[in-house]
Curated annotation (Swiss-Prot):
Regulatory subunit of protein phosphatase 6 (PP6). May function as a scaffolding PP6 subunit. This is Serine/threonine-protein phosphatase 6 regulatory subunit 3-A. It comes from Xenopus laevis. The gene is ppp6r3-a. One of its GO terms (molecular function) is protein phosphatase regulator activity. Residues 610-653, 714-742, 817-852 are annotated as: Disordered.
Length: 852
């Protein structure tokens, strides 16, 4: 898309193409020529389509560059030429596929003597492969005209790029009929026979490897094609040719000459393994050591392959005893002379594949040769070769897990023979598998007890022993295996049973991965409810964790949550679960009860709301203030404070509205026991504190007079705050003579409204109100002259009586500061502004709080 829509920046190539004498090399020197070509620059494509330019491009990839050139730029033009020709531009592909002269020039590269230049061979193979893919009819027709094409391919098969070209010819042709024609053509050219001839000791290792890989890929591709096109009328000719008995005999005869060549033997075994390979090997990955049975795939092994291998089993067995000569190998733990070698390892892999077929005749041949005994000897001899141990383990597992001998691949004479599992009997009776396992285990324990190193095969030996136990208990041959254990000598039986219960059991327990908790949890049907799937997506919950802000918690971004499951959640909480909880709730009720109002029992006392008062209450000029730090409305505080100085006209009939039941039920109880020096009982205080009669006369010396104070606030606008007010504890020191440190205190403020300021002896309208002060140490009486608007504080000394009645809920405690006693006398109405300011400060210091 980048090249198609011309999203790249402009280059210098367009400027060069405007010149008449521009050359191909000048354009190839530009860094962005490849990008311009893929973008199908019209001028550039037209320039490259010139006959001389295409010839130069093909020449660059088919001829060796000069030797005297610098190595850094020697293959610059061949590489760019290959990339330009394979840029998948349709015009270039069409011109190459239709111009026979260019194809001949390209084909001439195969006429060079071997070995070919690997880099140029890769360029040639890449260009011809894309032509086969884009122009299959033209290229196949051209190659068929060349009689020596297959010979040249076989000649240069040692070059990997040529082998890739052969495989491309088999895979890149999509039309089924054309592909079938190519297969028939290659089969007629006897390409299979020629590849088999290469697997010969006289050829070099590269030719062995590439020829073997080519044959293996042909087998796999042919079988895959058979699966894809199941209704194909014609079988794959190349696969059918390779599975012929004479071809297989030729392959095996080439490797078993007097001169043993490891490369040729390994390459031939790779071809045989591919022929024996089913669609998916039963033990690929070796996941399950003891499968209940061997699963055969859709591909059945050709009888010709089994017959050809069976004839050469003695030769393969001899390779185990006498492999090709190899040098001495030095390892970290010792010297291997001779080492296992790649030959013997591949022979054991071949035997494992033969055991998977479970053919009776092959099993009989292996028993006669005692091949399994030789393999077991190698298992214990080479204690550190895990490749060998894995293959031996697979062989034993196949024998133990496979059913009786299958007559599927047997001849008519073999079908009349016994159907017993002869190979399993051979393992227990002739190979003495149980005895060898016990001996090796004992040797390892002895070696470890002496401080030696553990044998490297012990892990595989443990798995083999577990496989035997599994086969005896649950395997397809459990009856026969159990009988074979009983047929062992008594001593061997006892040792095996002891080994299974002690050593093997301890090893398995040690190798078992325990859970984090050591306590074994036994599941039951009741646990299903506890392990229900959550009703939300765990991934979305993790991603949304911590994003509580609205811009991160959009409903569209949250995973699909099943809200219907919320109803399934059952919360069963016991209110009396803890005594501490009940005690805490009772304490909270006691502290909040003093703020309760008869008409707002169910309201939230801490909720801020508008307060409406009856008209009768608004006529009174009473207010309370608090210095609490919890207060949030500063204007309300100022209004409450200024309310102390407002004048009001109060009738004699106006009294404090107190509910008798509420007053009697009001309780103030604190956790800390307190002792009061002066406590007034309910009987003595209740009649005086709430009465509207003229208060007792007391000495007024030491108190300020605010006769000239004028309140700027209208009396009618004054309201009485009914909201609960938090008490504030004063930081002033407590007089130890009058107030105990833990005593309950109550401040009584008496406000007297005097109607006639000239007659001091007449009875004046008064209003008294009891207010709880947070300082808990002052008892004050405030008398306000309604006419002259004079406010006088009076101390209530001697008015309160002490009561020791435990039922008393109200207490009045007097506490006077020495500073208050030394206050200046009452000033006339002509007092200065400074005096009124100081008096107002003193007045503001007295905080009056009353019950709601």
């Amino acid at each position: 898309m980048f090249w198609k829509f011309d999203l790249h920046s402009s280059s210098h190539i367009d400027t060069l193409l405007e010149r008449d004498e521009v050359t191909l090399k000048e354009l190839m020197d530009e860094e962005d020529i490849l990008q311009e070509c893929k973008a199908q620059n019209r001028k550039l494509v037209e320039f490259l389509l010139k006959a001389e330019c295409l010839e130069d491009l093909v020449t660059f990839i088919t001829e060796e560059p000069p030797q005297d050139m610098d190595e850094k730029i020697r293959y610059k033009y061949p590489n760019l030429s290959c990339e330009l020709l394979t840029s998948d531009v349709s015009q270039i592909n069409d011109r190459l596929g239709e111009d026979e002269s260019l194809l001949k020039r390209l084909y001439a590269f195969l006429l060079n003597d071997p070995p070919l230049n690997p880099l140029l061979a890769s360029f040639f193979s890449k260009v011809l492969s894309i032509l086969i893919s884009r122009k299959p009819e033209q290229i196949v027709a051209f190659l068929k005209q060349k009689d020596d094409f297959v010979n040249l391919i076989i000649k240069h098969i040692g070059t990997s790029a040529i082998m890739d070209l052969l495989l491309r010819l088999l895979t890149c042709i999509e039309p089924p009929q054309l592909r079938q024609d190519v297969l028939n053509w290659l089969n007629e050219e006897k390409i299979i026979q020629r590849l088999v001839e290469i697997v010969h000791p006289s050829q070099d290792e590269d030719r062995h490897s590439n020829a073997s890989q080519s044959l293996c890929e042909i087998i796999r591709l042919s079988r895959d094609q058979m699966l894809q096109v199941q209704n194909s009328s014609e079988p794959d000719p190349l696969l059918a040719t390779l599975e012929k008995k004479e071809i297989l005999e030729q392959l095996l005869s080439n490797i078993f000459l007097k001169e043993k060549n490891e490369s040729a033997i390994v390459s031939a075994i790779q071809i045989l393994l591919t022929l024996l390979e089913t669609r998916r090997p039963a033990f690929e990955g070796h996941i399950d050591l003891c499968p209940p049975g061997v699963n055969y795939s859709a591909f059945s092994v050709n009888k010709n392959v089994l017959a050809a291998i069976q004839e050469r089993l003695p030769s393969f067995h001899q390779l185990l005893l006498d492999p090709p000569k190899t040098g001495v190998m030095k390892t970290t733990w010792g010297i291997l002379d001779p080492p296992v070698g790649n030959t013997r390892l591949n022979v054991i892999r071949l035997i494992a594949s033969l055991l998977q077929t479970n053919t009776h005749s092959i099993n009989e041949e292996l028993i006669e040769l005692n091949t399994m005994g030789v393999i077991l000897d190698m298992f214990f001899k080479y204690s550190w070769n895990n490749f060998l141990h894995t293959q031996v383990e697979i062989c034993l597992a196949l024998i133990l897990a496979s059913p009786g001998d299958s007559p599927e691949h047997s001849t008519i004479s073999e079908q009349n023979s016994t159907g017993d599992h002869v190979l399993l009997k051979h393992l227990f009776l002739k190979c003495h598998l149980i005895d060898r396992i016990l001996e090796a285990w004992a040797m390892n324990e002895k070696r470890q007890s002496e401080g030696g190193q553990r044998y490297g095969y012990m892990g595989h030996l443990t798995r083999i022993a577990n496989c035997i136990v599994h086969s005896i208990e649950k395997g397809p041959n459990s009856v026969l295996a159990h009988q074979l254990i009983k047929d062992l000598p008594t001593d061997a039986q006892e040792r095996w049973e002891t080994f299974c219960t002690s050593s093997l059991g301890e090893t398995n327990k040690r190798n078992t991965v325990d859970l984090v908790t050591t306590r074994h949890i036994h599941s039951s049907s009741d646990d299903e409810i506890e392990f229900k799937d959550p009703g939300f997506s765990q991934d979305s919950a993790i991603q949304q964790f911590g994003f509580n802000d609205e811009k991160f918690a959009d409903q569209d971004d949250i995973g699909n949550v099943s809200f219907d499951r919320v109803s399934d959640i059952n919360f069963s909480l016991n209110a009396n679960e803890s005594a501490n909880i009940a005690l805490f709730e009772a304490c909270c009720k006691e502290r909040i009860q003093q703020f309760d109002d008869g008409g707002s029992d169910e309201e939230d006392i801490w909720e801020e709301k508008n307060i409406a008062f009856p008209q009768e209450t608004q006529r009174r000029s009473s207010s309370g203030s608090t210095d609490s730090e919890e207060s949030t409305d500063s204007e309300e505080e100022e209004t409450v404070k200024q309310g102390l100085f407002e004048s009001s006209t109060v009738n004699h009939e106006d009294k404090m509205e107190v509910d008798a039941n509420e007053a009697s039920n009001w309780t103030a109880n604190f956790d800390i026991p307190m002792e009061t020096a002066h406590v007034a009982s309910l009987d003595s205080v209740g009649s005086d504190a709430w009465s509207t009669e003229e208060p007792l006369s007391s000495k007024e010396t030491g108190w300020a007079s605010f006769s000239e104070f004028t309140s700027p606030i209208n009396t009618k606008e004054t309201i009485r705050s009914s909201s609960p007010v938090e008490m504030e504890t004063s930081t002033e020191p407590v007089d130890p003579l009058s107030v105990n440190a833990s005593a309950q205190t109550e401040v009584t403020v008496a406000m007297d409204a005097v109607s006639d300021g000239d007659e001091e002896g007449e009875n004046a309208d008064q209003m008294t109100e009891t207010v709880m002060n947070g300082s808990m140490k002052e008892t004050l009486s405030l008398t306000v002259d309604a006419k002259t608007e004079t406010a006088v504080f009076k101390s209530e000394e001697g008015k309160l009586t002490t009561s020791h009645d435990s039922a008393c809920k109200y207490g009045v405690v007097e506490n006077f500061d020495s500073a208050m006693e030394n206050a200046p006398p009452t000033q006339p109405s002509s007092s200065s502004q400074e005096q009124r300011t100081s008096e107002q400060i003193v007045l503001d210091g007295a905080s009056a709080n009353g019950p709601v």
